[in-house]
Structures are given as C-alpha cells and as structure tokens.
Amino acid sequence: MRIANLKKAVWGLMAFASTLVCVMDCYPLIPAVYGVYCLSSGHTIIFYIGLIIGMGYFISIPSICKYLFIIAVIYFGERLFVRKSSKNGCVTTAVVAACATAVMNLSVTFLGRPDTDEIVLSVAESLVVFSMAFALCRACEYLRALEHNENPVIAGISG
C-alpha cells in the first residue's frame, strides 16, 4: 500500500517538476512526462493536480492553452496507437508527443508571419520532446523490470 502511494506521489512531483524546466519559453518536459504517464498503469488524480498547480503558477496563459491542447492530442494518440497495437510503446509515445508538439507549434507559427527562428525553435522543441519522452519511458521500463526482478534490458525490448 505504501509503495502504491509513493508511486502516486512521485507521478505528482514529476508533473509539477516538468513545469519548472523552461527553455526559451518552451516547456519540453510537459508533453514528455505526460506521454510516459499515459503508458503507466497507475493513473491517479495527483498527477493532474501537480500538473495544474505547476502550470498555473509558472506558465503564462497562452502557453497553458498550448500545452493543454498538446496533452489532449497525446492522450488520444496514445489511446489509438499504443493500446490497439503490440508495438513498442516507448517509440510510439515519443513520436506521438513530438508530432503533437510540432503540429501545435508550427500551426501557431504559420498563422502569423513565419520567421525562420520560430520554425527552427518549433522543430527543436519537438526533437527535445521526442528524446525526453523516449528516455523517460525507457527509464520507467527499467525501473518496472527491476521491481519485478527481471532482466531490465530484455524486459524493455520485449514490449
């Protein structure tokens, strides 16, 4: 029981901590952490509470709207691709999170007058989201395998 509560608290802290990392007015850990959270089996309201408190305190309102849209796209993408297929969830999660971030950023960029710097920043943020989502997902698979006393390398490859 205590380990389950500890996992819920860690997910809430990860959600809150993802709002603290800001790189050039972008928050690449929010989509990455949410994508990994969608793959986990222990869904909890504490994650959303940590995310909303962190976003409300540290992020501007237009950025909150942007990342809430990205989170919605990640949720539906996860439901479509990962749950219906037997493919590797890490790669799919990373691709869905990166594509959602890129589409949202590029659509906002092309609504105005597109600048080369904004396009490069949009692509760079989606690449950072891809790499962070993949790294966090592999780390969670590794920890889950260690918890069940399996070989973490083989457990991560199988599924």
Question: What is each of the regions a protein language model found here?
Answer:
Residues 8-12, 22-27, 60-68, 79-159:
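Membrane-embedded alpha-helical hairpins and interfacial helices in multi-pass inner-membrane proteins
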Residues 20-32, 46-71:
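Subset of alpha-helical transmembrane segments and adjacent helix-loop junctions
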